[in-house]
Amino acid sequence: MDQRRVFPWLEPSSGVLTQRAPHVTVIVPVRDESSNVAACVRSLLRQRYPNSRLAVLVVDDESTDGTALIVQSLAEEHAALKLLRTPPLPRGITGKSHACWLGAQSVPADTEWLCFIDADVRADQRLLGSAVQAAVDERLDLLSLAPRHDLRSFAERLILPCGLFTLAFTRQASDGGDVTVSGPFLLIRRRAYEAVGGHAAVGSAIAEDVALARILKQHGFKVELRSGDRLLSARMYTGWTTVWPGLAKNLVDTLGGPASALITAFIAIPLAWAAYSIPALDALGCLDRGESTACFALAPALAASAAAIGLHLAGAAHFRIPLWYALLFPLGYSAGALMVLDSVRRRLYGRVRWKGRAYP
């Protein structure tokens, strides 16, 4: 699989944007992000983008850990930074969509592009300039960038590479029929955002990023996902206690609905384990019992197994994690499949819980 074909890379722009660059407002929705928000905001304030054409708006969604105080302190030092506190969350809308929608209603009047960025993102100085230049040049209405993932814990390193491979394969299999975006970075033309009703139109969606991209595409707007590996990084989770609920809350939407998610899960498990089990069974049949069919099948089985391991070795190198994690990929897909089952269960029979809130 050619990663650049599935997720084309956005290379850093070498051009210099002038004071005639489009006005961009970056909206950062936050809820209990005291450990992340300062580093995120500082990286945004260091952008190589004309100061008069850039604003940063942090929307605090009823944080209880001092997040708003940190942002307020930074805002006193930087005129481009503003803090907006949300009122109590109304029924029928998720906290993130509520924060994003209120933020979009509070941007400067001359804002041409809205850029929604998660608090766990760290931005290279060239991020906004490169993204805006690409969006303008290619006449995009939504440009989403997948960040370079900072994987530190065992759970992150085991599961996230397998999950991203699965997402890439499902995107390739759909042949562009469905839309895929990466929630940590969404650059949206303001005119297009307002034309479809923005986050208010997808307020009840758990995976609001995917829902918004779909509605934009349905209305004829141009949506594109790129790899932003050289322009932004993110550590979305910190271990099992955040990986499981964080992924389970939106896997159903990300994989195209309950039926599609279940099919993906039930295909992934046998395929992953087949890389080890089939060569082992063929070797046993050939060497122990002398079965000619098993001996004939052993070489292609070993070749297929080597290809699967090689793919995940390349993935481990890409994610900058120890290569031995590549040998554990059947465990990663199995854990991911269990998360899919949990995601479907939550969606059909229970409530999705995230950051102290429950959504029907």
Question: Residue locations for each model-derived region?
Answer:
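Cell-envelope/extracellular polymer assembly enzymes that use nucleotide-activated donors
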Residues: P22-T25, A55
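Long helical/loop segments within the catalytic core of UDP-sugar-dependent glycosyltransferases
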Residues: V6, A79-V107, S130-V196, A200, ...
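A conserved acidic beta->alpha catalytic loop
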Residues: D60-I70, P87-P88
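Short, acidic, metal-binding catalytic loop of nucleotide-sugar glycosyltransferases
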Residues: R42-R53
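Membrane-embedded multi-pass helical conduit in multi-pass membrane proteins
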Residues: L262-Y349
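Catalytic donor/gating beta->alpha subdomain of glycosyltransferases that bind UDP-sugars
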Residues: A135-T166, R191-E194, H199-A261, Y359
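Donor nucleotide-sugar binding loop of glycosyltransferases
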Residues: E33-N36, S63, D124
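Acidic donor-binding/catalytic loop of UDP-sugar-dependent glycosyltransferases
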Residues: G66, I117-A134
